[in-house]
């Protein structure tokens, strides 16, 4: 099923019983977080708070609170179908030369479809039905959540940030949290390696001292939102990928104050500039680790204009100790990652990011082991192949007789197939999430690889253990008489 905008998605979810309208007045200060957290843990519906206390704009929460709703947002009917999206991305990331004329013809429709999904720029758009400029700009009109008791200020969480580097043809989309610090000021918390920060850095080099235009779209259609958090190849724009998911070209409109292009169907758009050198301390905030992060300095965005639809919806979320929405997104996008990794490493059978590992900090990989040292090659490949795994601290590699998604299996493999000294790989001074306060230096720390595979000659000189396997005939015999035994 495809959705033209956020409202269409909300309507379809409601028809399926996947959205609940909350008509009781609820405060965006702490109360919405508590309600969304309980609902998410119960695998409950998306929530539309129609009467946020002190505001006229309804708040949409827990939108991607189940893997099934993430799959729906990406145009799939089931989570299992996300593997097909992963296969498409794997092909587009590293397309293989055609093996012959027939193979070339078979691949041609894919490239045609990608080309046909180039974004479409329109002259009029719902996101500009209402325009607020200059002294009338007041971010206080938005029901921005204060999620946790120790949060320093309201925090915009689902802002789709649009930037463009001075040396690039294509725009960058990224989701960065933004602390509200005034009527027209927010802090842009983007890490140094992220696309928005790189674009801004290039701008400062090429246009020193000049204000840098930035736009933040709130409440875009689900395909565009999810396209911004998916490992899209550098050769494909997030807007084009969203078009592939949606089955129709992404409609964009030029901002009223810059040449940046934003989703035409977005509910709310913030337009503004970053003045080089204007920085502010951000935080502390409760984040996806379950802890409050330390205070750090980031650029300030001065909002010069707010445009929005008539009767807009404010899309929001919270981050906290898993499970939270980022963890659920990780579970769903895990299925996209598997084919991409398998394209590079065909020996990979499964790949799993346990949600309790804060979405990406731990990975479990099962492989068809083919030679001594194979597990170490795979763990190094995981760390280096996709930028999404740059911050993965622990990689566990097991044989394919282990279920990567069953901790009973994984722990058994670790405790029976590993020698801590021989089978542990430690790498120091590597990039680490700035939110990871356990690292000795902010943004720099170590990684651990655990080789929990059966050891081959060359890896051990001892006779290796032989796993116990039940006798099949006995199992069948007991299956036949089980009900007669009266044990259950």
From Swiss-Prot:
Binding-site residues, Mn(2+): 172, 238
Known catalytic reactions: a 4-hydroxy-3-(all-trans-polyprenyl)benzoate + H(+) = a 2-(all-trans-polyprenyl)phenol + CO2
Pathway in which this enzyme or protein is active: Cofactor biosynthesis; ubiquinone biosynthesis
Positions bound to prenylated FMN: 175-177, 189-191, 194-195
Co-factor binding comment: Binds 1 prenylated FMN per subunit.
Cofactor(s) the protein requires to work: prenylated FMN; Mn(2+)
Topological category with respect to the lipid bilayer: Peripheral membrane protein
One cellular-component annotation, GO: cytosol
Chief localization: membrane
Keywords for this protein: Cell membrane, Decarboxylase, Flavoprotein, FMN, Lyase, Manganese, Membrane, Metal-binding, Ubiquinone biosynthesis
Cellular localisation: Cell membrane
BP-aspect Gene Ontology terms: ubiquinone biosynthetic process
EC number of the protein: 4.1.1.98
Family indicated by similarity: Belongs to the UbiD family.
Subunit structure: Homohexamer.
Cited function: Catalyzes the decarboxylation of 3-octaprenyl-4-hydroxy benzoate to 2-octaprenylphenol, an intermediate step in ubiquinone biosynthesis.
Name by which UniProt lists this protein: 3-octaprenyl-4-hydroxybenzoate carboxy-lyase
